[in-house]
Amino acid sequence: MKTGDKALVDPKLTGLETWVEGKVIDIENNPFKGVVIAIEDKDGRIFFGEEKYFKAA
């Protein structure tokens, strides 16, 4: 996954009922959490978390 790709974020991270689709806006290698991904959805909401909560759309 790279910046600009479409991705889905797990409801376990968002607290919503369904997977949310968005565009990857940042990928960071966090020394404590590993790879952390941030996406922005069509409503302008930003979700970020560990790589395990994301999948390619």
Where are these regions (language model features)?
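Basic/aromatic-rich interaction segments and small domains that mediate binding to polyanionic partners
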Residues: 3-56
